[in-house]
Amino acid sequence: ISRYILEEHMNTGTLVRQRGSDCLDIRFGLYDYHGGLQCGETLDVKISGKWVPTRIEMGEDWYLVGIDVDDLIGLIVRI
C-alpha cells in the first residue's frame, strides 16, 4: 500500500491531555477522541507546514521521537 493511499485514510486532530490523567490523546472534534496514546504508537506531526512521521514515547514525560518541542499539547497530528 502506498503512503499516498494511507494518507487519505488518516484522521487529523490535536494532541491533548486526557482529563484526569497524565495520558495523551488526540482530539478530532468536539466529542471525538482517539482513545488514548500508547508508547510506541506511530503518528505524523505537522511541523512548519509539513507532515513529519514520528512515534510517541514516555521518559520523564511524553515526547515525540526526533521532534524537538517544549510542549506537545496543541500540536496538529494525524494517525
Put a short name on every predicted segment.
Residues 1-9:
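Short, Lys/Arg-enriched N-terminal segments with co-localized hydrophobic residues
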Residues 4, 31-33, 63:
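Sequence-level detector for tyrosine residue identity
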Residues 8-34:
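Mixed-charge, Lys/Arg-rich low-complexity intrinsically disordered regions
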Residues 9, 37-39, 50, 71:
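Residues that act as N-cap/strand-start positions at coil-to-secondary-structure junctions
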Residues 15, 43-45, 77:
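Hydrophobic beta-strand residues in large extracellular and virion-surface proteins
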Residues 17-19, 46, 57-58:
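Generic beta-strand structural signal
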Residues 34-46:
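Short coil-to-beta transition motif at edge beta-strands of beta-rich domains
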Residues 50-79:
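Short, compact, well-ordered microdomains
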